[in-house]
């Protein structure tokens, strides 16, 4: 498959003389007698030569190198003059790129270096695009770096040159070009995959990449549709054919994305959805055909259309005769994920090497233009301001954290509200036990969860699993010898499942008493009620109502202080914001220019004096922190007084013991509930696993009857073999009953067929001799197997490859 890149055109310019401009500037700055001290004729001539070469007729690669070098020189002069580059009084004249004949003589003239820099950057982006177009003919992949650099170049222009008089350098147009080159770079990456080997195996990746390319070209399409600069019958920017080519690519890559998504759905056996996306792909490729007039020789839409229609026809036929899958009436490409494969190289990174190359040249040519010392001092001063800001931000964040922690720890708003509602009408709470009420609410919730659970009877679940194991072993004992290998593999899975069960029940067994208690509402509350602290003596508050008023007065004071704390936090936030704005708006460049040549020691003193202007704001922030600490301490003292008045701290030794016992009981119940939640979550996985294993066992038994056959289970689909120790005399049924087959994979034992077949302890049927021990799992597979059993009790059940997924279909053959 082939594609095309939109052709970008170079801007032309008129010649200028940096020699003349610098001489004029230096004479005006230093006088007719001193200007030559700051002038270097050779290096200035080299700059003129560089600009001339950058706008010559050399090959794109050579022009690109010269334009990068000239852009670095412009960056150096801009660092020295900044917004005052117009003081050079040089006329920079640039023509518009000739995308239309009416633009051939259109030109703009400005004095600023910024205008010169933006025009040079435009040409760099165009040259990168032209080189990419040449590289594309040999290898699509080799064009991607050039397009990604061009994309970053135009993106930088759209964000930094906002008021350019040139149409080419206008922010909206450079933003469009950045998006266009981004789309083309994504397109090159996509073409590399489509034309590469095994494209069918990368259908999912291709659909995502094509979706991203589609989105980018849609943005370009919106530029033509929504641009306010467009006039009737013309396009807002570029050649007239660009709009049709972009529209074609929108439909083309929507078709490619949906077609490859069709192939993904086909692999997943979602035939109905695949057909729906196939119809969408056919529609889009037909729509693309209406815009092929400019690319009919480069892009083969007819061949792609035939491929899509043939695939759709095949899927419809298969669905009619085999799958009978429901075809959705409507599907959207938005359900296909996107993937951006382009990593742009920023403009700063592109220019970094060239900036280093022209340092000596610019230091000689521009030594009379605001020395770099000014920028060095400004950088040092900026770091001083940054250090001051970091200090204030750190102190503010710490104070905010202390405030938030105090409010959350004490739950102050709710505490004040509850205490006020208790005492506002002259009531008292001396006989209340708030801690007991909180515990009661939590235990009530836990008890309801346990009572509503289908797994609250843990021992019954243990017996249920044991019954399923025995049934499986009973069936396996009767399979024919030719199915012995399949039976052993199922038994191996059964042994590993028992190890997971052992871990599940081992976590819940120590808490059975508390779990049973949560399941028994009447017994639970008969025990819990013993821990309630009751005060049968007359309340002192009933005898002295003045304490109620004392409590309310202190609560009012606490509430007032809480509001002040909130206001202090808001004020601190405002002060910090003002502090940041003050730092950002501070500019001492002019002062530094006047202080050029001062020793570093003197500059340090000057910096410290300048920083004192921020002291008032810093002091206001520190004041809010100081007041906050005092208020928090005052609130703590008032809370202690309130608790003493309501008798919270006046407990008898017997009551203290009751509180400790209650807390111990609560902790046990809480631990039991948490273990039960884990148990009730993990156990269903095990039950589902046993049901599946039982179904397989029954089908294996059916396959053992005459006239039936079954293929061997692929050993690669089973987990690693378990290591084996010496044979134990106890039967597997007894081990299952005790739920203690093994505690770790490395200590597990593979039972002999005879022992596995026995479902009671009579030992009447000795069975055939034991199989030899299997080797330990080694290497990566063994390690992964061990880790899975250690990480979670039910990790074994989550393994989809415990047994062959196609075994059921084999049994039915």
From Swiss-Prot:
UniProt-listed InterPro entries: ALIX_V_dom, BRO1_dom, BRO1_sf
Compartments where found: Cytoplasm; Endosome
Region feature (Disordered): 704-729, 752-781
GO terms for biological process, alphabetical: protein transport to vacuole involved in ubiquitin-dependent protein catabolic process via the multivesicular body sorting pathway
Biased composition (Polar residues): 704-719
SMART domains the UniProt entry points to: BRO1
Biased composition (Pro residues): 766-775
Pfam families: ALIX_LYPXL_bnd (PF13949), BRO1 (PF03097)
Chief location bin: cytoplasm
Keywords: Coiled coil, Cytoplasm, Endosome, Protein transport, Transport
GO cellular component, one term: endosome
Domain BRO1: 4-403
Role of this protein: Involved in concentration and sorting of cargo proteins of the multivesicular body (MVB) for incorporation into intralumenal vesicles.
Family note: Belongs to the BRO1 family.
Name of the protein: Vacuolar protein-sorting protein BRO1
